[in-house]
Amino acid sequence: RSSAASDVYKRQYNISSQIFFKMLDNKDIIPCCTGMIQKEVAERIAAGPGSKTYGILSVLIQAWYKVEYLFTVSEHVFNPPPKVKSAVIRMTRNDTQELGCDEKLFKQVVKTTFNQRRKTLRNSIKPILGKECPLTEDTLFNKRPEQLSVEEFIDLTNKVEIALKEMNLQP
């Protein structure tokens, strides 16, 4: 019996995001996942930095998986037809074993900054670092979260962790 699991599915669309967060919690035993999901969610997962659809799911999944948007499925191939288009994506576990930063803090940084996605990092990181954010002189903080790659989020997380330690706060 293998310790790895794969998943091929077509899930209820209203719960697909929660399924992906659970998949991330079990990433060590899920090397590959192929599924048909709502097109909008598939586009968010596969989106790159700079895209309007790039967000929390994009960053967290792409930190651990290579994402391939395979194809779009018309609503007309189903009977009865749903009100939304579908898409098939494949996620294959990348070689990353460790992110190079505190994983729990990474998730917190990604979620916190994207919860205020139209603000610069200088302002969106304040819920974690407080109003007297010691890092705001760094040019990275002039960017908005949707402009950062996964690697830049890892760098940001390391900077936040150092700042928290300097302020005698725990990440």
What are these regions (language model features)?
Residues 1-5, 9:
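Single conserved hydrophobic/aromatic residue that forms the stacking wall/gate
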Residues 15-148, 155, 161-171:
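Class I S-adenosyl-L-methionine
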